[in-house]
Amino acid sequence: SGRTSNEAAFLYQLFVRQFGTNNLPDCSNMCHESSGSALSETIAIGKGTVTLADFDLAEAIFVIGQNPGTNHPRMLSALEQAKRNGCKLVHINPLPEAGMTRFKHPQHLLGLLGSGTALADLFLQVRINGDVALLKGISKAVLSSGALDRDFIDRYTIGFAQFVSSLNEVSWSDVVEQSGVSQTEIESAA
């Protein structure tokens, strides 16, 4: 876990091994089982393929359903650096997360003073279970803007025409109702 120190993790594994097992349940198999299955089916690997070093090159980062300040505090420094590099950060979550709205860098004296740095350029407060509708809305907005890399899509994806067809079956009013986010905000995120 991003909240656990190396020392605590070491003690945890010593404790668990006293019960005769080397199986150490953690967030990777308790919280991310469904995401691992979905990623395996979608991109053929059940884990993230992005490293924090990739943030340095990003023009936009979407933090979806994640609370980095609470669960992955080491990620906040990388997000802060990405923002300094000109990256736009969109935070999507049912609740605002303090680390994304007033980050105070603990290793910089000036970072501890004041009210903190707002990392998220845009916060979309999605309704619980409305994330799929929101992502469909973002996809609809990107599709209608024409901001697509057709060469990449043709070369590396399967089923894009079916995906577009499924998006066309969804109305903006349904997206807004199910996600709890306005069409204007969704288009701004796209």
Protein language model regions, located:
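Cofactor-pocket helix-loop regions in the catalytic cores of large enzyme subunits
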Residues: 1-190
